[in-house]
């Protein structure tokens, strides 16, 4: 046990509701909990007869406890989840994927647009959702585009149009930007979209049937056929999405445990339709119970800041959890409507729960199968490179066009695969164009010269290139000041540059590592190399495009940095500037009629 004097501390502890934070010797929060009676709850950790190994390990690391009193247990629950999100304590069960849920946005413009939206609701308009994933929103937008010809383009693109775009030719937009549709007809389609997104698709079909019949009576058979197609698509979508039963708004939470991995599957039902589903794999301390895992998940999922819109009126649980009444009260309070949590054993709700449980188990199986494949690749790579362990690998690549706009990339892989949060790009400057060796040295300097956290020193560094690049990397590491030295491996392409024919170089290229083309370890190296290459090329293209955009406008006398920025922002990038006619250019703030003529003539003389 630590030096923490729990006896003296407990004497001062209040019996009111509140939250407690346990800290270790580094003053880091290692556990956050809440209690209706703080003194009783915190005292329970320091009993002499604790049998739970997880609690014993936790207590052995406690060096201090901080408490915050609250008025009610509900307030304590809300504060607890905010602190868990803030500190990510290692002994708490953590929900790792806590991004805000996406919505469909219908803007309030004269000609409203449909758009994907995630985050704060600063844009004026109507928000529909939430949806379980970005893919669910994209699929819904794609389907609606086929049925309702409402624009989905950005405003800057919309304002810059002088003729219809490809979406109009595909009959997926009615081109209000160039007056191919009347305001009245466009508004009618927007009303249909609004009804459809609020679960009133039957009303939309009824309205469309009336419209089709009226068009037929007026012998407008082209319009009648167009409306008929809309009705058929709507009915097809209804069949795919509809569910039996009167479930207007319900979340079904499935749970499964297999081989040490826990999966929680969330099935979202809104407006009598299954919006979609998603499986979560919370980070769980050893020996956590199923009730603890589910309770922690529900709190972090529904009580996260900005999560009010995702709270369903009815939440179906796979089993009873402790303090479900407190959680229900908290959800009711923040959503300002009655929220019920229940366990069901019969009826259609039970069938959906069975489906959610099945999905949770299936997701675990798939994840473990994928992880097994990753583990196999890592194990073979460790054996091939003769390393005891590999917890972190980095790979560098250089991208440029004829020596210009050089960009270096560094991608990071850990035991789970790509760690995209750690990816970095470096704009290479101060070297001779096309000197890949100097560019590699520049990237290594940028990456490691100010390295403070030795835990981030990789076990292996892959250099995408031959002996020259690897040799320059070894020169850099010759004066490496840290105790841990990464293994440097060059990945040289074969003469045919085909995958599977790569040569692995070590010791400055003096030695090669033979590998079969179908070896799992080689597949892992190819994955890292390809990811580094992709990331470098993407950065290079962005830089090249930015330079092209700036250089073309920089050639125009009188168009300085401020005017360039205004033109690009107002007209939606260089494509918008090029597509604009003189009248549209004159509408840009700060652009006179003479300047508009000059810009238009210069851009079009350039072809």
From Swiss-Prot:
<dbReference type="GO" id="GO:0006289">
    <property type="term" value="P:nucleotide-excision repair"/>
</dbReference>
<keyword id="KW-0742">SOS response</keyword>
<dbReference type="InterPro" id="IPR001162">
    <property type="entry name" value="UvrC_RNase_H_dom"/>
</dbReference>
<feature type="domain" description="UVR">
    <location>
        <begin position="202"/>
        <end position="237"/>
    </location>
</feature>
<dbReference type="InterPro" id="IPR001943">
    <property type="entry name" value="UVR_dom"/>
</dbReference>
<dbReference type="InterPro" id="IPR036876">
    <property type="entry name" value="UVR_dom_sf"/>
</dbReference>
<keyword id="KW-0234">DNA repair</keyword>
<dbReference type="InterPro" id="IPR050066">
    <property type="entry name" value="UvrABC_protein_C"/>
</dbReference>
<dbReference type="Pfam" id="PF14520">
    <property type="entry name" value="HHH_5"/>
</dbReference>
<keyword id="KW-0227">DNA damage</keyword>
<dbReference type="GO" id="GO:0009381">
    <property type="term" value="F:excinuclease ABC activity"/>
</dbReference>
<dbReference type="InterPro" id="IPR000305">
    <property type="entry name" value="GIY-YIG_endonuc"/>
</dbReference>
<dbReference type="Pfam" id="PF01541">
    <property type="entry name" value="GIY-YIG"/>
</dbReference>
<dbReference type="InterPro" id="IPR010994">
    <property type="entry name" value="RuvA_2-like"/>
</dbReference>
<keyword id="KW-0267">Excision nuclease</keyword>
<dbReference type="InterPro" id="IPR035901">
    <property type="entry name" value="GIY-YIG_endonuc_sf"/>
</dbReference>
<dbReference type="Pfam" id="PF22920">
    <property type="entry name" value="UvrC_RNaseH"/>
</dbReference>
<dbReference type="GO" id="GO:0009432">
    <property type="term" value="P:SOS response"/>
</dbReference>
<dbReference type="InterPro" id="IPR038476">
    <property type="entry name" value="UvrC_RNase_H_dom_sf"/>
</dbReference>
<comment type="similarity">
    <text>Belongs to the UvrC family.</text>
</comment>
<dbReference type="GO" id="GO:0005737">
    <property type="term" value="C:cytoplasm"/>
</dbReference>
<feature type="domain" description="GIY-YIG">
    <location>
        <begin position="15"/>
        <end position="93"/>
    </location>
</feature>
<dbReference type="GO" id="GO:0009380">
    <property type="term" value="C:excinuclease repair complex"/>
</dbReference>
<protein>
    <recommendedName>
        <fullName>UvrABC system protein C</fullName>
    </recommendedName>
</protein>
<comment type="function">
    <text>The UvrABC repair system catalyzes the recognition and processing of DNA lesions. UvrC both incises the 5' and 3' sides of the lesion. The N-terminal half is responsible for the 3' incision and the C-terminal half is responsible for the 5' incision.</text>
</comment>
<dbReference type="InterPro" id="IPR047296">
    <property type="entry name" value="GIY-YIG_UvrC_Cho"/>
</dbReference>
<dbReference type="Pfam" id="PF08459">
    <property type="entry name" value="UvrC_RNaseH_dom"/>
</dbReference>
<keyword id="KW-0228">DNA excision</keyword>
<comment type="subunit">
    <text>Interacts with UvrB in an incision complex.</text>
</comment>
<dbReference type="InterPro" id="IPR003583">
    <property type="entry name" value="Hlx-hairpin-Hlx_DNA-bd_motif"/>
</dbReference>
<dbReference type="Pfam" id="PF02151">
    <property type="entry name" value="UVR"/>
</dbReference>
<keyword id="KW-0963">Cytoplasm</keyword>
<dbReference type="GO" id="GO:0003677">
    <property type="term" value="F:DNA binding"/>
</dbReference>
<dbReference type="InterPro" id="IPR004791">
    <property type="entry name" value="UvrC"/>
</dbReference>
